[in-house]
Amino acid sequence: MIAQISEFRMPRYREIPDVGLYLDQTVKYMNRYLAPLGCMEITTSMVSNYVKKGVISHPVKKKYSREQLASLIYIVLSKNVLSLENIDALFQMQRAHCTAAEAYDYFCDEVENCLPYIFGASPVSYTHLRAHE
């Protein structure tokens, strides 16, 4: 698993399909990208629930956009530590300060930077903490 994690790369905003995906296609896309992280698979019911709760917008003509896919990736990776209400509040703050593409790509960078430490592929350095003592 550590080998998979060290090679894991999240799709950047411009790499997410911009053709509009139906619900089943959206779920397959999400699960394919997130499988190496060992995340619980997302289901069509989960996506529909996020739409009903207003965390992501309704699909247009039953198709999910690039921005909605990026939001779903964020939700799946964040929902274990944040409530849907907090995630929705963060989305609202993000919209006030930067584009979805900027916020999502920044999130991808930070996730990729943290993964080796979370999964033990890189030793944690505490030298920066000692400097402040």
Please state what every model-predicted region is:
Residues 100-120:
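Non-DNA-binding regulatory cores of transcription-related proteins
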Residues 127-133:
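Conserved small/polar residues in nucleotide/adenosyl-binding loops
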Residues 1-95:
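Basic helix-turn-helix/winged-helix DNA-binding cores
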